[in-house]
Amino acid sequence: MKKEKLRIENISFQYPGAATYALKDVSFSLYEGEWVSIIGQNGSGKSTLAKLLNGLFLPEAGTITVNDTMVLSEETVWDVRKQIGMVFQNPDNQFVGTTVQDDVVFGLENIGMPREQMIERLEQALQLVRMEDFLNDEPHSLSGGQKQRVAIAGVLALQPSILILDEATSMLDPQGRREVVETVRQLVTQKGITVLSITHDLEEAAQSDRVIILNKGEILEEGTPEKIFKSSHMLQEIGLDVPFSVKIAELLKRNEILLQNTHLTMESLVNELWRLHSKK
């Protein structure tokens, strides 16, 4: 059985002066080597959840537990932040070094890590995100996707238990989004890194292992991407869309082209269409 890395139990939070709760009785767990996506329209509670996980706010009720032992509180917030690494929305706002290597080692320098160990962590982190060839590059020479991969490397160098992506692809072009999503998938499948992605990008969510839908501060549904995106009517009712490949597959089925699988990527859909065509 996989180790539980993060446990959210019955958390609720209400902003001062607000008439309703931003989050109400939310519970879920995140396990080692798992990639979970949280989706929902604006006002669903996604941003509030990110702030709670980072310790910017504390829940009014319920608990947040990391590694089965550490409960988030005013006393433990700094220890929890060492275990949870966050990558945010704007890649330019996260780049603090004059070169890629300066940026990645920034956090390591702040904790006084010995130089030899720092160099080892730097090399490992850049290899994980496939940016080792850009060691001395300046930020202005990098694409948005490359900057986010460097931001991920900076977090990984600190070796947190959990990587949280807070709308980390929302300001990127399609190529940049693909780069980051491919990097995250490799980190999960090849290195067993645990990832929580808070996103409005359904193409990104479709690549994760599990999807949780937040709606008006509560969990509406939870399951595999295949299960979630089959319910296109439910998603549309709460203001969400479905991945483009799912839309195309539904149109094909209406035209009596019988597909065997749920397709979350265009590549998967094209492959099945090719197989069907080859049988004719």
UniProtKB/Swiss-Prot annotation:
One of its GO terms (molecular function) is ATP binding. Its EC number is 7.-.-.-. Pfam families: ABC_tran. Residues 6-241 form the ABC transporter domain. It is a peripheral membrane protein. Disulfide bonds: none annotated. It is found in: Cell membrane. GO terms for cellular component: ATP-binding cassette (ABC) transporter complex. ATP binds at G40, Q41, N42, G43, S44, G45, K46, S47. Signal peptide: none annotated. This is Energy-coupling factor transporter ATP-binding protein EcfA1. It comes from Bacillus cereus (strain ATCC 14579 / DSM 31 / CCUG 7414 / JCM 2152 / NBRC 15305 / NCIMB 9373 / NCTC 2599 / NRRL B-3711). The gene is ecfA1.
